[in-house]
């Protein structure tokens, strides 16, 4: 039995690269689709937001002389490409999936609104919400917080390449220890970088818990949904 009825799954664009330096690794993409299919079959309503960092990141573009607004718009389009790829992989595995876009671009995807997203979820579709918030200067973490709150998700699952939140970066500090759970206030006081401050504050103020977990290990998404204690739970 699933622990949550409706979730918002946040995936990074970089994670779609798999072992590549750029773009989309089809093996990784299909592994993610298979994991999502597993929990869809449990009856979970699944909203998804994917970043675009495997294709273009607005902030890094700005540091190289791009206009920040144009750079962020390029990043938003990158999230649409990733969303279409994941949608296609899900449909190929027999899962109904719809892409909604924060900026009008029919027929690529329907224009996002909360009520349509919830309607599609309740009809059994995986709903992939692309284009960030539709505005520059907001990260896809903030976009996923916003969408999670709007669709009234029970939890946001942040799929990453590490298995939770640590006292320090475990890839740099071998003495770093993992939290099984942590409060939003403690994240602030410790200065931990789970998401950017805007995204974290939105989740805290709207009482949306986050579970940070390793999405790159097959089967982990189902384990989280089954209530197994993997990853780190962030809560008020």
UniProtKB/Swiss-Prot annotation:
Its main location: cytoplasm. It is found in: Cytoplasm. Pathway: Pyrimidine metabolism; CTP biosynthesis via de novo pathway; UDP from UMP (UMPK route): step 1/1. It is an enzyme of class 2 (transferase). Belongs to the UMP kinase family. It comes from Parabacteroides distasonis (strain ATCC 8503 / DSM 20701 / CIP 104284 / JCM 5825 / NCTC 11152). Its EC number is 2.7.4.22. The keyword Secreted does not apply. Keywords: ATP-binding, Cytoplasm, Kinase, Nucleotide-binding, Pyrimidine biosynthesis, Transferase. NCBIfam families: pyrH_bact. GO terms for molecular function: ATP binding; UMP kinase activity. It catalyses: UMP + ATP = UDP + ADP. CDD domains: AAK_UMPK-PyrH-Ec (cd04254). Homohexamer. This is Uridylate kinase. One of its GO terms (biological process) is 'de novo' CTP biosynthetic process. GO terms for cellular component: cytoplasm. Catalyzes the reversible phosphorylation of UMP to UDP. The lineage of its organism: Bacteria, Pseudomonadati, Bacteroidota, Bacteroidia, Bacteroidales.
């Amino acid at each position: 039995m699933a622990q949550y009825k409706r979730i918002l799954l946040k995936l990074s664009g970089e994670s779609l690269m798999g072992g590549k330096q750029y773009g989309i690794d089809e093996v990784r993409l299909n592994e993610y689709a298979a994991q999502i299919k597993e929990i869809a079959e449990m009856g979970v309503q699944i909203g998804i937001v994917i970043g675009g960092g495997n294709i273009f990141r607005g902030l890094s573009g700005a540091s190289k002389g791009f206009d920040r607004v144009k750079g962020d718009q390029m990043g938003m389009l990158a999230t649409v490409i990733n969303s279409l790829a994941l949608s296609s992989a899900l449909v190929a595995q027999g899962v109904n999936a719809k892409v909604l876009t924060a900026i009008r671009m029919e027929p690529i995807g329907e224009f996002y609104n909360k009520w349509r997203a919830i309607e599609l979820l309740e009809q059994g579709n995986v709903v992939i919400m692309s284009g960030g918030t539709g505005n520059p200067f907001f990260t896809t973490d903030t976009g996923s917080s916003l969408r999670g709150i709007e669709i009234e998700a029970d939890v946001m699952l942040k799929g990453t390449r590490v298995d939770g939140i640590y006292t320090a970066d475990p890839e740099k500090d071998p003495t770093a220890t993992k939290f099984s759970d942590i409060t939003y206030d403690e994240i602030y006081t410790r200065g931990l970088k789970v998401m950017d401050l805007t995204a974290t504050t939105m989740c805290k103020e709207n009482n949306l818990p986050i579970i940070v977990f390793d999405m790159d290990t097959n089967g982990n998404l189902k384990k989280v949904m089954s209530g197994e204690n993997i990853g780190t739970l962030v809560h008020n």
